[in-house]
Amino acid sequence: MADPEKLFKVIVVTPNGMIYSHRGSIVDVRAIDGERSILYNHIPILTPLAISEVKVKRSREMGSRIDHIAISGGYIEFSNNVATIVADSAERARNIDVSRAQAAKERAEKRLREAREKHDERNLERAQVALKRAMNRISVYNARGH
């Protein structure tokens, strides 16, 4: 008989509300200091996250499906077998409008060129962050197999 699968609650929230709430067996995140994989009974943590993809491996009953979520930074807290991700913004791969993300990427690239030409450090940093967010959304959309 197979061992019972150990699942924990995974929640992703933004200022606009809850984006995701399911049970998973593994959550992969990119903290600002590197990759992290969280499993059932992981030690409690609170760590800042980079603009990146969050992967949630669902239960065997769900075919061990992996849910892909684009986040624009934030924090993950894990305690008592609940992973809570609080992000500035988050989007499930299935909800990403890739044409909007591509347009945002092009706008950010234009703003980046203009900021470099004008030696405008403040707008350069903003454009770099906007470009990372757009590229992350496109990458997460493509990771889902589109």
From Swiss-Prot:
Pfam families: ATP-synt_DE, ATP-synt_DE_N
Activity regulation information from UniProt: Increases 2-fold following exposure to low pH.
SUPFAM superfamilies: Epsilon subunit of F1F0-ATP synthase C-terminal domain, Epsilon subunit of F1F0-ATP synthase N-terminal domain
Stated induction or repression of this protein's expression: By low pH.
Keyword set, alphabetical order: ATP synthesis, Cell membrane, CF(1), Hydrogen ion transport, Ion transport, Membrane, Transport
InterPro entries: ATP_F1_dsu/esu_C_sf (IPR036794), ATP_synth_F1_dsu/esu (IPR001469), ATP_synth_F1_dsu/esu_N (IPR020546), ATP_synth_F1_esu_C (IPR020547), ATPsynth_dsu/esu_N (IPR036771)
Keyword Membrane: yes
Keyword Isomerase on entry: no
Recorded topology in the membrane: Peripheral membrane protein
Source organism superkingdom: Bacteria
Family to which this protein belongs: Belongs to the ATPase epsilon chain family.
Protein name (Swiss-Prot/TrEMBL): ATP synthase epsilon chain
Gene source species: Lactobacillus acidophilus (strain ATCC 700396 / NCK56 / N2 / NCFM)
